[in-house]
Regions:
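Helix-loop-helix junctions within the multi-pass membrane cores of secondary transporters/permeases
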Residues: 250-332, 389, 400-407
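Transmembrane alpha-helical segments and their short flanking loops
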Residues: 303-407
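Juxtamembrane helix-boundary/capping and inter-helix hinge elements in multi-pass membrane proteins
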Residues: 64-73, 159-163, 200-201, 237-240, ...
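Hydrophobic transmembrane alpha-helical segments of multi-pass transport and channel proteins
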Residues: 47, 83-87, 91, 217-221, ...
């Protein structure tokens, strides 16, 4: 049994995942009624979501209480990259929406949902998440609260006994080992997730909303393969695409199927470790990115809002479009703190153009219909960009120090 397990682990993870992906598609088409297969996906995502909050909490405390040097410069660079890329994504989304305008088929039937009334509501939600009880934050996977309390406790523990610090290191190493075990289960998890998607949705989602999906996905791909590499080149002064494709394989692929930035945090952290990045830095920037680095969310909010405006015959001028870009970027940063994520921030953006709330909620309903594709690509972009930009910022520091940068 041990030999079989060792043989399994010796195979490249990406090859195992591709195998699971192919098997999931085949089973979804041949035996769509075999619902038990989907359980593998549920267990995989559940395990990642369960370990991620604890991993982030312990890693950040352990890193900060041991840290004798400042990592503020790298972290500051990462935050700037996160914010700039999100604003840039919303601006690009405005241009693509203008170049390829899309209208929507609205219906009367939709389910009323609660959405934020203003940008103030979004930031109020973020502020309340920061000061939420740390135990509650862990159980609810509130990463803003987890990060805030972990930073405070980590700084306070800098004067703790060495035995206490060593214990925290041992716990963080143990949790990292558990993450490795879970990641080795990824091929089965991906198989279950793909099976569930194919057996329940088939290809029908492409037929009715194909043009809208092409606009959303095309814009997201443009950000990942064109604008993000420019940011990487600015940091490293090297060909960015080896790093771009590494992050695509190691992070975007799993994020696409889990559809959860939180579940992908352990995977991104493991890849940062494999790249030789500083744990004191990435233990903060990766979970922070899962909260505020929301290129995909900014694109979704912008494209869906402009599609609603086109449908109602509302002309959006350049100043209004710029204002929408800023609003979408700021809103996207709070998407993780809103139930329903980016889709439920659409009504707030629609209000900028006087679009009635009932129409805006129908647009949200369309968003949920295409979510099987839109949300998957959005999460893949968001999560892989966390890894890409975190690595780029640290490589920028390496370049300044004269260290060799290898992808």
């Amino acid at each position: 049994m041990k030999k079989l397990l060792d043989k399994w682990i010796s195979i490249s993870l990406i090859k195992r995942i591709i195998g699971g992906l192919a098997l999931g598609i085949i089973l979804g088409l041949l035996v769509p009624k075999a619902s038990g297969i989907a359980l593998f996906g549920s267990v995989f995502v559940g395990a990642l979501k369960a370990i991620a909050p604890l991993l982030v909490f312990v890693l950040v405390i352990s890193s900060l209480c041991h840290s004798g040097k400042s990592h503020g410069g790298v972290i500051k660079t990462v935050i700037i990259l996160y914010m700039f890329s999100t604003v840039l994504a919303s601006v690009i989304a405005v241009f693509t929406s203008k170049l390829f305008p899309v209208t929507l088929t609205l219906t009367e039937g939709f389910e009323e949902m609660s959405s934020p009334g203003s940008i103030g509501d979004v930031f109020n939600s973020l502020l309340m998440n920061i000061v939420e009880n740390p135990i509650t934050s862990l159980t609810k996977a509130n990463y803003v609260g987890i990060l805030a309390w972990a930073v405070v406790i980590g700084i306070a523990c800098r004067h703790a006994k060495e035995s206490t610090k060593d214990m925290l290191v041992d716990i963080s190493n143990g949790l990292s080992k558990v993450v490795t075990w879970i990641i080795n289960f990824a091929p089965f998890g991906i198989m279950g997730l793909v099976f569930d998607t194919v057996s329940n949705n088939g290809m029908s989602v492409f037929k009715e909303y194909g043009k809208l999906l092409m606009l959303l996905v095309g814009t997201m791909l443009f950000i990942y393969f064109v604008t993000n590499p420019i940011l990487v080149f600015w940091c490293t002064h090297k060909n960015p695409y080896p790093l771009v494709f590494r992050c695509l394989k190691k992070s975007a692929l799993t994020a696409f199927f889990t559809r959860s930035s939180a579940a992908n945090i352990p995977i991104n952290m493991k890849e940062c470790e494999d790249m030789g990045l500083d744990r004191d830095t990435y233990s903060v920037t990766i979970p922070l990115g899962a909260t505020i680095n929301m290129d995909g969310a900014a694109i979704t909010i912008t494209v869906m809002t402009l599609a609603a405006a086109n449908t109602l015959g509302i002309t959006v001028d350049i100043p209004s479009a710029i204002l929408l870009s800023i609003l979408a970027a700021l809103s996207a940063c709070g998407a993780s703190g809103v139930a329903g994520g980016s889709l439920l921030l659409i009504p707030m953006a629609c209000s900028l153009f006087g679009i009635p709330n009932d129409v805006a909620m129908q647009v949200v309903g369309i968003g949920f219909i295409i979510g099987v594709i839109q949300d998957s690509v959005e999460t893949a972009l968001n999560s892989s960009s966390d890894l890409l930009l975190s690595a780029s910022a640290e490589f920028r520091q390496w370049r300044k120090e004269g260290r060799e940068i290898t992808y």
